[in-house]
Amino acid sequence: MAPKLFTFVSALSGLASLASAFHAEAKSNIAVYYGQGVNQPRLAEFCAETSYDIINIGFINSFPEQNPLTGLPGSDFGNQCWADTFVVDGIASQLYSHCPNIAEDIPKCQAAGKKVFLSLGGATPTYWFDTIDASTKLADFLWGAFGPVTDAWTVADKPRPFGNAVVDGFDFDIEFFGSKGYANMIKRFRRRFGEVPDQTFYISAAPQCSIPDEQLSVAIKNAVIDFVWVQFYNTPGCSARDFVLGTKNGFNYDSWVEVIKAGANPNAKLYVGLPASGAAANLGYYLTPEEVKPLVKKYMDKYPETFGGVMLWEATQARNNQIDGVGYNEKIREILYDLDPNHPPPTTSPTPTPTPSTTTTSTTSTTSTTSATSTTSTTSTTSTTSTTPTTSTTSTTSTTTPTPSPSPSTASSSTTETVTPSPKPSPSESSTTSETSSLPSTSTPVVSETPSETKTPTSSSAPPLSSSSPVGGSSSTASSSTSTPSETPSASSTRAVSETSTHISTSTSSGPETSLTGSSTSVPATSSSVPSSAISPSSTPVISETPRPPVTSSSSSTFVSSTSTSTDCSESSTAIGTHSSSSISETPSASTPAASPSTSPETTKTLTVFPTPGSSVSTGTTSASTLSSSVPATSGGHTETSTVSTSSANQTPSASTSKPLIPTNSASSTSTGSVTSTPSAPGVPSSSAGSDETATTSTTDSEPTSTSSGSVTAKPTTTEPATTTTIIVTSYTSICPTGFTTITTTITSTYCPGTASATATAIAPTTDVPGSGSGSSPAQPTITADIPEGWTTTVTVCTVCAATPTTVTLTLPPATTTEESTSAQPTGEVPSSDGSGSGEVSTTTVVVVPAPTGNAGDGVPAPGANVGEEYTAAPGSATTSKPLIGGGASGAHTAYPYASSTFHIIPSASAHVPVPSGSGSSPSGTQGGASPTFTGAGSRYDVVKGVPALVALALSLLAVL
């Protein structure tokens, strides 16, 4: 015991020496889950290992809506918390209040260069949002409880489960009911992150490998996520095992890259999620290090900008899986470092949102005399470079520093502007303007900035702007024009700057076109006795934004979209759509400098483009939508009103799936409307010399406008022999004068596939394929069947079967008939996708136990789930690579195709049993270090294995009777 303790203390003391900077943009990082391991060590022991870069502590496994009496979420961190929970008005909550080891170890991990995230979700269907507002409130609570400590939170004595420890981000391992709330929640987190600008926080997500992932596809498409570690295990057809086997159209990392590129953050890093041992996932999904290396090499080389590394489920499994004397995680680290010798990269961590870049430098020199009349001529040249990747964010910063001189003849000022769009090449542009003028004079610089996004090479030109000023008989003229031929978004600017400037900035977007106009006035002071000028400019930028519709089709591209999502409170669960444009959000902000010779006015404009996917749809028609916004010019604030009007959007996408699409329902829906948005989100002013101006955006949205019509009609069929005759020799139990007796009988069963029928209903999805989420793979049905035709079940009292009269249930054959026709289809309980389930499952008592064909206990779909039929989804259905159980436009559930079987288990009376949450009603710390029942992103197949055990128990009871 003492040597072990000494080793642990030594490991902790060595954390500082092992510290290395975390690099979010690296392609050889390892992320791991912690909190659900069997007899897991302390967090600090894993942080003492050099292999891990990100550690997700899981889970927050229920939300306030599931705990209405306390209004607090629930948690489960395994054996790392005491049994105490927070109490609200005398009622104990599900949120553990004392987790001292984690509270002590998080700062140590961070000192060692690790990032620690708090993970939400897990493998139990005990969490969901009923409203969007609930997701906002939960984000605020988690930020207060696990984010930076604030005085307001402390004074209110609100929960801090990890004490003063602060997590580095939040992870979403959402496996049930994920269609509502999560995109909004991530956006809310992003806003709260802005409250601590000197610290970087991250968002990660762990979807299943099927595309679209039914739980997180909406969030990935609409909210900025930094890391996506796909669970490439426990789901047949898209797992890493399919890569090893060479399955055609199997391992789908390439498709996930496309999902990332079409999402809200095309610069997100994509990790390969793998089980850390054979026991961490279903049988067959574990990959040896020798199998992992070629996979990592191929995709690290193919997508060096997107590949982020490997995610492992989970830390304790990795440590226990010793290979050549080291843990599995160390083997994976060796592979990553071998293939990426430059790790860690020399660059600094990027900001979470993408920022492409161009640079414009403008230098102005002015020569002044005391002449009463002057003429100012300004010319400017512009070089424009276009970037190929989609621009996600454009940030423009302009700084002007006029420098007065005591000399009567010269004054100079310089302007440097940096525009930062990012995916890649840094296009640069420069312009130099020189002018000679006589004092007093007034000149007007013109800044014209025209980002354009077009389908075909076109050019847009800003009309010349001219101004004249009759001060002292002087006049000035400035003109600018911009020509931007490009196929992809590009930014160009023409800039003419003078010493005493009225700053005019015009920004034109080819989708919704807007102009951004700012003005500032500088007044030179002259001395009447000395022919010299002392320049003391006073600058007051005023920003106004005037909407303009696209001028012509040749110089701008029209926004065309069939589905749009524009605000936090409006999310679309449609995972696949065709869009030929982007939705643009912009947040202009400006700073108002003090009037002094060293004034540095700075104007920042952020333009975020959210591209939408344009694949997986074979036919479709959309109509143009026009987005316009008007912004009044004010000196103290910025208000933006946006209106989205959609005339009519009709979309008829069609898709097909290579695996059964189970619902056989026909439904159509049509909705037409318009979205009026008044953005309401606090802006972040950017200032270099102090500013009291705040850009405010206020948003109120109805549902995005889209009109769609379609029907889903999928009719699974099977091909079987015309008639199957089965002769079964079986036995049943009856009563004779001396007690129970067993009678052997013969049953001849004739099965005709043409007359077979099947039905399926849906309820709590607790027996999904482990780790694959609700809906992304079929639930494990409760198998039932009719008793043979003519057989009857009776209840009687037997006086000779035991010491006392005993009530027994008997299933007896008919007296004269031995033939019956059996149903080829069992009835299964499959999940509902509305997120409103009660979270309970049924436990059944088995009466008749003829076994069905197939293996229902190995964590894979029940018999017939993969019978090889190919179904085609009607227009309007989503593409999926896995069976879709139940669901549809009307919520009806239809039959699941199964192969024929002679008998099925017959459940009798049911009793409702609550679904275990997390590792049970209390953490494993109160159970002597026992393993949690469910393991989040890991395997859930142990639950499925309980079905055969139940059958065996029932048989043994019958035998005793």
UniProtKB/Swiss-Prot annotation:
InterPro entries: Cts1-like (IPR045321), Glyco_hydro18_cat (IPR001223), Glyco_hydro_18_chit_AS (IPR001579), Glycoside_hydrolase_SF (IPR017853), Glycosyl_Hydrlase18_Chitinase (IPR050542). GO terms for cellular component: cell tip; extracellular region; plasma membrane; side of membrane. It is a lipid-anchor; GPI-anchor. Keywords: Carbohydrate metabolism, Cell membrane, Cell wall, Chitin degradation, Chitin-binding, Glycoprotein, Glycosidase, GPI-anchor, Hydrolase, Lipoprotein, Membrane, Polysaccharide degradation, Secreted, Signal. SUPFAM superfamilies: (Trans)glycosidases. It is found in: Cell membrane; Secreted, Cell wall; Cell tip. Its EC number is 3.2.1.14. Residues 338-720, 767-787, 813-842, 912-933 are annotated as: Disordered. The active site is at E175. GO terms for biological process: chitin catabolic process; polysaccharide catabolic process. Residues 342-355 have a biased composition (Pro residues). Residues 28-339 form the GH18 domain. The keyword Secreted applies. A lipid is attached at G936 (GPI-anchor amidated glycine). Residues 1-21 form the signal peptide. One of its GO terms (molecular function) is chitin binding. It catalyses: Random endo-hydrolysis of N-acetyl-beta-D-glucosaminide (1->4)-beta-linkages in chitin and chitodextrins. O-glycosylated but not N-glycosylated. PANTHER family: ENDOCHITINASE, ENDOCHITINASE A. GPI-anchored chitinase involved in the degradation of chitin, a component of the cell walls of fungi and exoskeletal elements of some animals (including worms and arthropods). Required to reshape the cell wall at the sites where cell wall remodeling and/or cell wall maturation actively take place such as sites of conidia formation. This is Endochitinase A. It comes from Emericella nidulans (Aspergillus nidulans). The gene is chiA.
